[in-house]
From Swiss-Prot:
GO cellular component terms attached to this protein's record: cytosolic large ribosomal subunit
HAMAP family per UniProt: Ribosomal_bL19
Highest taxon listed in the record's lineage: Bacteria
Gene Ontology MF term list: structural constituent of ribosome
Family: Belongs to the bacterial ribosomal protein bL19 family.
Record's protein name: Large ribosomal subunit protein bL19
């Protein structure tokens, strides 16, 4: 590994200790809690929607979440290892066959739904 990759690995290790990053894929419903500063006040804001893309680039990894708010589509890109992202929770697992779900942008209503993954059971 070169120097930059070593530094990236160290930083990812430090950030992973502070906050657990769940295993999620495009198609999953996520609730992302973000620290928002307005003036001198700081609060936690939740953004819940479908993960439509994930880019794995080491410390620069990010993911895109899409939701429909008051009839308008809203997308937000979150850096995976940002200190402003306080929590990422998977609320529902989806089954898709694509890595990027940009086709959901052109769909409305029932055609924009994603099938839910079957629950995994540990049968002994």
């Amino acid at each position: 590994m070169n120097v930059i990759q070593t530094i990236d690995a160290e930083q990812i290790g430090k950030l992973a200790e502070a906050r657990a990053v769940p295993d999620f894929k495009p198609g999953d419903n996520l609730r992302v809690s973000v620290r928002v500063t307005e003036g001198e006040r700081t609060r936690i804001q939740a953004f819940e929607g479908v993960c439509i893309a994930r880019s794995n680039r080491g410390i620069n990894s990010n993911f895109t979440v899409r939701k429909i708010s008051y009839g308008e589509g809203v997308e937000r890109v979150f850096p995976l290892y940002s200190p402003n992202v306080t929590e990422i929770a998977v609320t529902r697992r989806g089954v898709v066959r694509r890595a990027k779900l940009y086709y959901l942008r052109g769909r409305r209503g029932k055609s924009a739904r994603i099938a839910e993954a079957a629950r995994e059971t540990n049968a002994d």
